[in-house]
Amino acid sequence: MRNYLLLSAMTCLTAMAQEQAPMVLQYDKPATYFEESLPIGNGKLGALIYGSTDDNVIYLNDITLWTGKPVDRNLDADAHKWIPAIRKALFEENYALADSLQLHVQGPNSQHYQPLGTLHIKDLNLGEIKHYQRTLNIDSAIVRDSYQRNGKLITREYFASNPDKLIAIRLRGDINCQIALTAQVPHQVESTLGQLTMTGHATGDPQESTHFCTMLSIKTDGEMAASDSSLTITKAKEAIIYIVNETSFNGFDKHPVKEGANYLEAVANDLWHTQNMTFDEFYARHLADYKAIYDRVKICLNKNNRNPNDLPAAKDRRMTDQLLLDYTNGGDQSQYLEELYFQFGRYLLISSSRTKNVPANLQGLWAPQLWSPWRGNYTVNINLEENYWPAFVANMAEMAEPLDGFIAGLAANGKYTAKNYYNIGEGWCSSHNSDIWAMTNPVGEKRESPEWSNWNMGGAWLVNTLWERYQFTQDKEYLRNVAYPLMNGAAQFCLRWLIENPKQPGELITAPSTSPENEYKTDKGYHGTTCYGGTADLAIIRELFINTIAAGKVLGKKNKEMEKALAKLHPYTIGHMGDLNEWYYDWDDWDFQHRHQSHLIGLYPGNHLTDATLQKAAERSLEIKGDKTTGWSTGWRINLWARLHKPQQAYHIYQKLLTPIAPRGSKGSQWKIWHKGGGTYPNLFDAHPPFQIDGNFGGTAGVCEMLMQSTLKDGQATIELLPAAAEAWKEGFVSGLCARGGYEVNFEWKDGKVRDCSIKAKKAGTVTLLYNGQQKTIKLKAGQKQNIKTW
């Protein structure tokens, strides 16, 4: 059958008429470990539900509850005086001395993200448990569990509402239970009939800490009694629990006590609001709010390869943990699991990133432990950026809004870091770690390795997310008022941080330089971290300059100094193994399979590494890295392989991401067949290990990148369909993906060929569509949707 392009007035396509399979995580037993619990969240308030039949533990979080207070902007005002000595040591090739001197250019580590509290719902009934079931319905953002005790059915439902700022729980059946609130942070609990109130503060001096108030109210048709710190419900057929919380956090630069928000008044208003509607009315508002975002994207990767027993309606459905286990151990590469993981990533971002100026952190929103791994902070040398990779392409641009204010806070503090640590009076910079207080100084506390501590490219990398938002949305006012000032500020710092290369006059390099968390081995055998002219630094700066210059052109601004500096940047080089060099010299990595691949930023998430020879070298770098790494790095590598148009490799890495990983500290024979290392936990959380949410988001973005890629240059958009789609994805469809230039794309495929496609434009423009080895240019008016038949 000959291929042809038909532009028609069709109102729908076969692809868009098809249904996505129900997206439901399902289990037949309660959670024992955090990595089995089910998350709900409204972007600020979150919960991890274990679903026990005896003591149902529910961990609560508020994304604004952190230790600490605003940073001291004048800290280490003389640290920059060490920079000349470090440069001198480097250019004399005395790397050991440079490493040791770097310790003087370190400041304090970040603050900690902390858990809010723990809710206990204890079933006071006795008797045998049968027919247990626990689900998270991603399509409708609700957790349900049910069981029979002595033949009597008990059901429980849980959701977190963004429009009404609450968590709601409904218990039905033979309800006799005790309800208690406690916390790992300093707190006190008071009870009155039908209500619990818990007040407390983050760990630390109460006069210097963020305070909170959690209020819980109960409506029931049964009897209630109150003790000192708990409530008891008896003889009930239904009980509804509402939980609200507010903190004194009032902004990155406001003292949480002296200038704190009026959290007590706010939480009282939140609780009063719960009296105005029923559980079902609250849920209807929650569902409408959630589905307005979630329903934008539907996906089917292989409609003819679905095992009926994998779907929620199946009588003998395989549980999600078994589905995950069979995927790797049983060789059953279920496309349903791949779709479920994709949509779970979208669910997590919608549920964790809706608080002004407070983006999702390493834990997203969900942290049951008092001291989260890596402080639960913002790690800006990959992890925070990766959190937002799916935001635009997977049609959730609003979820990236918390980054805008957060980056503005980094810029405000970062101009002091630029002056204090680097003697640069223009622009701003940010380092490896940050927290809710927008900390920007290099970390390490003058005693930790420079490989992660001494790095000042965080802001320069992070602001490219703002440019991505403009490319996808074409919101010129956003570019003018938000993105460009922050991008230009980061670029101004970089312009002044670059120095002329004494080894090659006329070139510009950075010194000192590190490649995030990686280490080199010199040709003389020295094992170190500090260098000059590191490829990652220059890749970030190159991407930033290209994007800032492009943004300036859109706004009618000239950046001649930046253009000249861009042309002088030390170029990429290729090493003795055919790989892209990560270091100025052709040195080997100390660990060839290191988890970071920061020198490949220009390939993904950047867009400037387009030269075929350099792409081949990047491919060789990935081959050397291999396929065994952390969860978040696996997510990154899916995208890198997809950018190289290598579907087999991209899919192989996606399969690796779905390796079943046993929970931390798990015991028992059932866990012996589960794996260790990077992959996916039973509840589909990403395993670094431990849990880091960025791997989930990297995986979701990776599926998008395999299905569709787009570029925008000088106002001309190009969209490529199925650039790296897996061969296993025989026949499917996707709707609602977004492309650079302001386009929304739906299409279906069969046997690697696009069958039908539609494109909708947010603004008037011309787009080049690449599909089935063909190229076609289409002109669209603002709001216009074109349906395209490709067979």
Model-derived segments and their meaning:
Residues 43, 471-474, 499-502, 553, ...:
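Hydrophobic alpha-helix feature that most strongly marks membrane-spanning transmembrane helices
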Residues 106-124, 693-740, 744-745:
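Catalytic cores of secreted or luminal carbohydrate-active enzymes
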Residues 368, 493-551:
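Acidic/histidine-rich catalytic neighborhood
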Residues 382-392, 456-467, 536-546, 598-607, ...:
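Well-ordered alpha-helical segments within folded domains of soluble proteins
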Residues 18-450, 468-470, 480, 488-491, ...:
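Aromatic-residue-lined binding/catalytic grooves and analogous aromatic/hydrophobic interfacial grooves
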Residues 364, 368-369, 508-512, 518, ...:
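C-terminal catalytic domain of Rieske-type non-heme iron oxygenases
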Residues 1-20:
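Bacterial Sec-dependent N-terminal signal peptides
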Residues 469, 476-497, 542, 641-657:
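Extended amphipathic alpha-helical segments enriched in small hydrophobics
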